[in-house]
């Protein structure tokens, strides 16, 4: 086996779950805020359109721009219902907020013209546009805020589907993890020691030059949170490593043939070079030292957690796994912001702790 394959194992690419955005009325019915606010908006719109029609049918003067404001409000209500049915509210939050802000300006302007105008039939129209203005203001507060804001979390707590995931928190966690990974470079001293002992001490600048206190050392900071500690190597570097491996093996064989008295010493050099890369286990590699791809028994996953909302793994991080909302996961470590977990299909990796909730305490190790 070549050195490069031991240093940089090929990780499994996490599968990304396809989000279902088909038309479902239950997406709308499952959100009490959507049902209540849109229902009130429809009632207010009917009052406004009824009062406007009755007022315009008489000799009373009626502001013509109000008609466009009423039609525009109807389009906003229909769009909101479609966004909820297709579960696309989070994808169009900016569009929804700006559109409702325009409707708020239209309705407040119409309310000013109708309240101070003469005619009893304009009272119903003014009441309708005032109610629409209030509802629009509430919508701006909700859709303009992030899902992690206190108001949105309180409102979403009444929803059957639970609290919506926050794109802001998700991006901050991923940026923090990338920063931690980039500030903890790893250098395998066994590679340098084997080259030096074999007589081919060549300066190699492929990795950051730092000297840990002993061989086969991995920074504890890099292991915190199961960070990815494997170095970045190119194809040219891998070719260079394979060439050095052949030269080392040739030198070791020559020493064994010419000097039988040092046979034990040469054997130790070769064995140390092969086994230290796998941390004493020839069936694992550097990536598997983290325990993410090895076969682990059920007894090690002593916690159970329930997913509060779905999560899509990052393509740039091979250790993350995706999961669906309300999915039950087995967890083996609950310290830090990222937990090691396993899905029901056997997929193992790390998950963000703020996306799940523990539902069971530690199980007995021997049952």
UniProtKB/Swiss-Prot annotation:
Q: Which residues are sugar-modified?
A: 59
Ranges of biased composition (kind: Low complexity): 259-272
Write out the annotated subcellular location: Cell membrane; Bud; Bud neck; Cell projection
- State the GO CC annotations: cell projection; cellular bud neck; plasma membrane
Is Phosphoprotein one of the keywords?
A: yes
The record describes its membrane topology as: Multi-pass membrane protein
Matching entries from Gene3D superfamilies are given as: SH3 Domains (2.30.30.40)
User: A Pfam family name for this chain?
Assistant: SH3_1
| Membrane-spanning segments | 33-53, 66-86, 94-114, 123-143
What is any one GO biological process for this UniProt entry? Answer: regulation of actin filament polymerization
State the SUPFAM superfamilies in the record: SH3-domain
- Keywords from the named record: Cell membrane, Cell projection, Glycoprotein, Membrane, Phosphoprotein, SH3 domain, Stress response, Transmembrane, Transmembrane helix
Q: Give the region (Disordered) as residue ranges.
A: 252-276
**Domain SH3 span(s) in chain numbering:** 300-361
Which residues are exposed on the Extracellular face of the membrane?
Answer: 54-65, 115-122
- Residues that the record marks as modified (Phosphoserine) are 166
InterPro entries annotated for this entry? SH3-like_dom_sf (IPR036028), SH3_domain (IPR001452), Sho1_SH3 (IPR035522)
Q: Which residues lie on this side of the membrane: Cytoplasmic?
A: 1-32, 87-93, 144-367
Superkingdom is Eukaryota
Quaternary state and interactors = Forms homooligomers. Interacts (via the SH3 domain) with PBS2. Interacts with FUS1, STE11, STE50 and RNA polymerase II.
Family membership noted in the UniProt record = Belongs to the SHO1 family.
Function recorded in the entry: Plasma membrane osmosensor that activates the high osmolarity glycerol (HOG) MAPK signaling pathway in response to high osmolarity. Detects changes in external osmolarity and activates PBS2 through the stimulation of STE11 and targets PBS2 to the plasma membrane. PBS2 activation leads to changes in glycerol production that helps to balance the intracellular and external osmotic pressures. Activates also HOG1 in response to heat stress and mediates resistance to oxidative stress. Involved in the regulation of the mating pathway. May be a receptor that feeds into the pseudohyphal growth pathway.
Q: What is this protein called?
A: High osmolarity signaling protein SHO1
Annotated source species: Saccharomyces cerevisiae (strain RM11-1a)
């Amino acid at each position: 086996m070549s050195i490069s394959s031991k240093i940089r194992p090929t990780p499994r690419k996490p599968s990304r779950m396809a989000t279902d955005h088909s038309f479902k009325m239950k997406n709308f019915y499952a959100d009490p805020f959507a049902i209540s606010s849109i229902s009130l908006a429809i009632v207010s719109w009917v009052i406004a359109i009824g009062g406007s029609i009755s007022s315009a049918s008489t000799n009373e003067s009626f502001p013509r721009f109000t008609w466009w404001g009423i039609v525009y409000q109807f389009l906003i209500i229909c769009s909101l219902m479609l966004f909820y049915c297709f579960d696309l509210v989070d994808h169009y939050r900016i569009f929804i907020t700006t559109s409702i802000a325009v409707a708020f300006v239209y309705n407040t302007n119409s309310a000013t013209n109708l309240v101070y105008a003469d005619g009893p039939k304009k009272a119903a129209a003014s009441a309708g546009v005032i109610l629409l203005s209030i509802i629009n203001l509430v919508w701006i507060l909700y859709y303009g805020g992030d899902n992690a804001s206190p108001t949105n979390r309180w409102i979403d707590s009444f929803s059957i589907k639970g609290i919506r995931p926050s794109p802001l928190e998700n991006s901050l966690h991923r940026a923090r993890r990338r920063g931690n990974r980039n500030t903890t470079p790893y250098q395998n001293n066994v590679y340098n020691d084997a080259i030096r002992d074999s007589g081919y001490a060549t300066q190699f600048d492929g990795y950051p030059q730092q000297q840990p206190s002993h061989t086969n050392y991995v920074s504890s900071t890099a292991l915190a949170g199961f960070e990815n500690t494997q170095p970045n190597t190119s194809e040219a570097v891998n070719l260079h490593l394979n060439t050095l491996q052949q030269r080392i093996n040739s030198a070791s064989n020559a020493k064994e043939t010419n000097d039988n008295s040092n046979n034990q010493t040469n054997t130790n050099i070769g064995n140390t070079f092969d086994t230290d890369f796998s941390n004493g286990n020839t069936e694992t590699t550097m990536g598997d030292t983290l325990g993410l791809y090895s076969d682990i028994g059920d007894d090690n996953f002593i916690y159970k957690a329930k997913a509060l909302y779905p999560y899509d793994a990052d393509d740039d991080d091979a250790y993350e796994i995706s999961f669906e909302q309300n999915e039950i996961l087995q967890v083996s470590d609950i310290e830090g912001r990222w937990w090691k977990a396993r899905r029901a299909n056997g997929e193992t990796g790390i998950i963000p702790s703020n996306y799940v909730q523990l539902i069971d305490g530690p199980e007995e190790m021997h049952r």
